[in-house]
Protein backbone atom coordinates (compact mmCIF):
# COMPACT_ATOMS: atom_id res chain seq x y z
CA UNK A 1 0.00 0.00 0.00
CA UNK A 2 2.92 2.33 0.65
CA UNK A 3 3.99 2.10 -3.00
CA UNK A 4 0.49 2.94 -4.22
CA UNK A 5 0.20 5.84 -1.78
CA UNK A 6 3.61 7.02 -2.97
CA UNK A 7 2.37 7.08 -6.59
CA UNK A 8 -0.81 8.86 -5.55
CA UNK A 9 1.07 11.48 -3.53
CA UNK A 10 2.95 12.75 -6.60
CA UNK A 11 0.24 12.36 -9.20
CA UNK A 12 -2.69 13.72 -7.21
CA UNK A 13 -2.28 17.42 -7.97
CA UNK A 14 -1.41 16.88 -11.62
CA UNK A 15 1.75 18.98 -11.37
CA UNK A 16 4.52 16.65 -10.23
CA UNK A 17 6.11 15.04 -12.14
CA UNK A 18 3.72 15.65 -15.03
CA UNK A 19 0.09 16.33 -15.69
CA UNK A 20 -2.20 13.64 -17.02
CA UNK A 21 -4.16 15.54 -19.62
CA UNK A 22 -7.15 13.23 -19.33
CA UNK A 23 -8.04 14.38 -15.81
CA UNK A 24 -5.56 13.41 -13.13
CA UNK A 25 -7.77 14.11 -10.12
CA UNK A 26 -10.57 11.94 -11.50
CA UNK A 27 -8.18 9.04 -12.04
CA UNK A 28 -6.80 9.28 -8.52
CA UNK A 29 -10.13 9.60 -6.74
CA UNK A 30 -11.58 6.90 -8.97
CA UNK A 31 -8.85 4.49 -7.90
CA UNK A 32 -9.12 5.52 -4.24
CA UNK A 33 -12.86 4.70 -4.37
CA UNK A 34 -12.34 1.43 -6.23
CA UNK A 35 -12.71 -2.12 -5.02
CA UNK A 36 -9.03 -2.61 -5.85
CA UNK A 37 -7.84 0.13 -3.49
CA UNK A 38 -10.27 -0.99 -0.78
CA UNK A 39 -8.91 -4.53 -1.00
CA UNK A 40 -5.38 -3.18 -0.73
CA UNK A 41 -6.29 -1.07 2.31
CA UNK A 42 -7.94 -4.15 3.86
CA UNK A 43 -4.67 -6.05 3.60
CA UNK A 44 -5.09 -7.92 0.31
CA UNK A 45 -1.64 -7.28 -1.08
CA UNK A 46 -2.53 -9.16 -4.28
CA UNK A 47 -4.95 -6.36 -5.21
CA UNK A 48 -3.80 -4.34 -8.23
CA UNK A 49 -1.70 -1.29 -7.57
CA UNK A 50 -0.58 1.49 -9.88
CA UNK A 51 2.71 -0.33 -10.40
CA UNK A 52 1.16 -3.70 -11.35
CA UNK A 53 -0.83 -2.23 -14.20
CA UNK A 54 1.39 0.65 -15.27
CA UNK A 55 4.87 -0.29 -14.14
CA UNK A 56 6.98 2.31 -12.39
CA UNK A 57 8.94 4.71 -14.53
CA UNK A 58 8.97 2.61 -17.68
CA UNK A 59 5.33 3.44 -18.41
CA UNK A 60 4.43 3.51 -22.06
CA UNK A 61 1.55 5.18 -23.84
CA UNK A 62 -1.53 3.10 -24.59
CA UNK A 63 -0.61 3.63 -28.25
CA UNK A 64 2.65 1.72 -27.78
CA UNK A 65 2.01 -1.97 -28.57
CA UNK A 66 4.53 -2.96 -25.86
CA UNK A 67 2.66 -1.07 -23.15
CA UNK A 68 1.00 -3.18 -20.44
CA UNK A 69 -2.08 -1.02 -20.94
CA UNK A 70 -2.23 -1.01 -24.74
CA UNK A 71 -5.49 -2.26 -26.16
CA UNK A 72 -3.91 -5.57 -27.18
CA UNK A 73 -2.30 -6.12 -23.77
CA UNK A 74 -4.88 -4.85 -21.30
CA UNK A 75 -6.70 -8.19 -21.00
CA UNK A 76 -3.43 -9.93 -20.13
CA UNK A 77 -2.64 -7.19 -17.62
CA UNK A 78 -6.05 -7.59 -15.96
CA UNK A 79 -5.68 -11.37 -16.06
CA UNK A 80 -2.12 -11.55 -14.73
CA UNK A 81 -1.39 -14.08 -12.01
CA UNK A 82 -3.86 -13.99 -9.19
CA UNK A 83 -6.12 -11.47 -10.85
CA UNK A 84 -8.99 -12.00 -13.28
CA UNK A 85 -7.70 -15.28 -14.70
CA UNK A 86 -11.08 -16.91 -15.33
CA UNK A 87 -12.35 -13.76 -17.03
CA UNK A 88 -9.23 -13.73 -19.19
CA UNK A 89 -9.91 -17.33 -20.17
CA UNK A 90 -13.47 -16.36 -21.18
CA UNK A 91 -12.20 -13.37 -23.15
CA UNK A 92 -9.50 -15.32 -25.01
CA UNK A 93 -10.86 -16.41 -28.37
CA UNK A 94 -14.00 -14.30 -28.00
CA UNK A 95 -15.24 -12.18 -30.87
CA UNK A 96 -14.09 -9.13 -28.94
CA UNK A 97 -10.53 -10.41 -28.55
CA UNK A 98 -10.43 -11.43 -32.20
CA UNK A 99 -11.49 -7.91 -33.17
CA UNK A 100 -8.82 -6.35 -30.95
CA UNK A 101 -6.24 -8.70 -32.49
CA UNK A 102 -7.25 -7.44 -35.94
CA UNK A 103 -6.73 -3.83 -34.79
CA UNK A 104 -10.45 -3.10 -34.96
CA UNK A 105 -10.66 0.19 -33.04
CA UNK A 106 -14.31 -0.53 -32.22
CA UNK A 107 -13.63 -3.91 -30.58
CA UNK A 108 -13.79 -3.68 -26.79
CA UNK A 109 -11.39 -5.00 -24.20
CA UNK A 110 -11.71 -5.13 -20.41
CA UNK A 111 -11.54 -1.41 -19.67
CA UNK A 112 -14.01 -0.43 -22.38
CA UNK A 113 -16.78 -2.10 -20.40
CA UNK A 114 -15.44 -2.11 -16.84
CA UNK A 115 -13.54 1.16 -16.73
CA UNK A 116 -9.96 1.85 -15.78
CA UNK A 117 -9.55 3.08 -12.25
CA UNK A 118 -12.95 3.44 -10.54
CA UNK A 119 -13.86 -0.24 -10.64
CA UNK A 120 -16.64 -1.08 -8.20
CA UNK A 121 -17.51 -4.35 -6.53
CA UNK A 122 -20.32 -6.37 -8.07
CA UNK A 123 -22.20 -5.93 -4.78
CA UNK A 124 -22.43 -2.13 -4.88
CA UNK A 125 -26.01 -1.09 -4.18
CA UNK A 126 -26.06 1.51 -6.93
CA UNK A 127 -24.14 -0.60 -9.43
CA UNK A 128 -26.39 0.30 -12.35
CA UNK A 129 -25.41 3.94 -12.01
CA UNK A 130 -21.74 3.14 -11.32
CA UNK A 131 -20.96 0.53 -13.95
CA UNK A 132 -24.06 0.45 -16.14
CA UNK A 133 -26.33 -2.49 -16.66
CA UNK A 134 -24.59 -5.08 -18.84
CA UNK A 135 -27.40 -5.34 -21.39
CA UNK A 136 -27.48 -1.57 -21.75
CA UNK A 137 -23.71 -1.54 -21.96
CA UNK A 138 -23.68 -4.08 -24.80
CA UNK A 139 -26.52 -2.28 -26.52
CA UNK A 140 -24.51 0.94 -26.60
CA UNK A 141 -22.40 -0.63 -29.35
CA UNK A 142 -24.65 -3.33 -30.76
CA UNK A 143 -27.54 -0.89 -31.23
CA UNK A 144 -25.42 1.84 -32.78
CA UNK A 145 -26.34 1.97 -36.47
CA UNK A 146 -22.87 3.26 -37.33
CA UNK A 147 -21.03 0.50 -35.42
CA UNK A 148 -23.40 -2.23 -36.58
CA UNK A 149 -22.95 -1.30 -40.22
CA UNK A 150 -19.20 -0.74 -39.95
CA UNK A 151 -18.58 -4.05 -38.16
CA UNK A 152 -21.49 -6.22 -39.34
CA UNK A 153 -22.62 -6.74 -35.73
CA UNK A 154 -25.67 -8.64 -34.58
CA UNK A 155 -28.37 -6.17 -33.59
CA UNK A 156 -30.47 -8.25 -31.20
CA UNK A 157 -27.96 -8.42 -28.36
CA UNK A 158 -30.43 -7.30 -25.72
CA UNK A 159 -32.98 -9.87 -26.80
CA UNK A 160 -30.52 -12.76 -26.98
CA UNK A 161 -28.37 -11.85 -23.97
CA UNK A 162 -30.23 -14.00 -21.45
CA UNK A 163 -30.10 -16.98 -23.82
CA UNK A 164 -26.31 -16.79 -24.17
CA UNK A 165 -23.58 -18.01 -21.81
CA UNK A 166 -24.42 -15.08 -19.53
Give the positions of each predicted feature.
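Short sequence/structural segments immediately N-terminal
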Residues: 1-166
Amino acid sequence: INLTDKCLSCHKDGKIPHKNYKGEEELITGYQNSVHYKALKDGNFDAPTCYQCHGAHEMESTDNPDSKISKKNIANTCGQSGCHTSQLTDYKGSIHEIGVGKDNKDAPTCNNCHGNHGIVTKNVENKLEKSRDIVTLCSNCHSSVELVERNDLPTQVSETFSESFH
